[in-house]
Amino acid sequence: MLKNKSVVSIDDVQNDDLFEIFDLSESMLKTIESKGNAPLLTNKIMATLFYEPSTRTRLSFESAMHRLGGSVITVSDTKTSSAAKGETLADTVRMASSYSDIIVIRHPLEGAARLASRFTSKPIINAGDGSGQHPTQTILDLFTIKKELGSIDGKVITMVGDLRYGRTIHSLIIALSRFDVKVNLVSPEILRLPEYVYSMLPDRNYVKEYNDLEEVIGETDVLYVTRIQKERFSDQNEYQSVIGSYSINSETVEKMKKKSVIMHPLPRVDEISPDVDNMPQAAYFRQAYYGVPVRMALIYKILGD
């Protein structure tokens, strides 16, 4: 049960809750498209604390809360908040919790959301902590796979790009261990999946590593593409050595199954060519669209009756 619980890691969401969120997300999507809003949380307030830039995640959380009839108070620029004066994360969270019923936080330091949860009894939702995890994106990604392809089990998921710093990758590969899937990892050597993420998997048998996307593109059901995380590199020469390592274009997509999808947590830089956008496999804008109903479902599971 997620009632009044924090979601800091994808491990905080058990399978029963996950499938309930999927069903509720479908209902929320239908409500949005027919009525616009589902005023189920009219007396609730969400605080959003974003210490890192965000467009889709912040807007989708705020839209989700508004569509549920709730209110939002936000800090989207820490330069204009007391954090600029040296206020600790703990004190900011304590203050935000006194003004709200739930807190959504994004922070550049891995583990910040878990730390924040120690200083409040209010639910904390992790909207991304450095190169750690991004659990709500993972719920959205799993929902997208299920909605687009009918099921998650039996699929081949190929992840390509920045597997070292990409927190969406880390959360998703952990969650996929619950399903009957095969996962292909394609990246430059220096952007391989970190060993600590491997250590969180029950086994490695469903995961294989490759350097060449051509080896696995034909068997792929879900091509999950990520940008190279420039902001995570301490050595910009290292970044320059890997930028543009993989670029998905229409020729790449022609080698994929007809019934397959390309996903991306966005924003993209140059890893997916615009000539892919109108191809039937391109699901990344639909994926972003599903973000609001999925987050509505999660928020309601936490705060609803």
Curated annotation (Swiss-Prot):
The keyword Transferase applies. GO terms for molecular function: amino acid binding; aspartate carbamoyltransferase activity. L-aspartate binds at K85, R167, R227. Keywords: Pyrimidine biosynthesis, Transferase. Carbamoyl phosphate binds at R56, T57, R106, H134, Q137, L266, P267. GO terms for biological process: 'de novo' pyrimidine nucleobase biosynthetic process; 'de novo' UMP biosynthetic process; amino acid metabolic process. Its EC number is 2.1.3.2. It is an enzyme of class 2 (transferase). It catalyses: carbamoyl phosphate + L-aspartate = N-carbamoyl-L-aspartate + phosphate + H(+). InterPro entries: Asp/Orn_carbamoyltranf_P-bd, Asp/Orn_carbamoylTrfase, Asp/Orn_carbamoylTrfase_sf, Asp_carbamoyltransf, Asp_carbamoyltransf_Asp/Orn-bd. Belongs to the aspartate/ornithine carbamoyltransferase superfamily. ATCase family. This is Aspartate carbamoyltransferase catalytic subunit. It comes from Thermoplasma volcanium (strain ATCC 51530 / DSM 4299 / JCM 9571 / NBRC 15438 / GSS1). The lineage of its organism: Archaea, Methanobacteriati, Thermoplasmatota, Thermoplasmata, Thermoplasmatales.
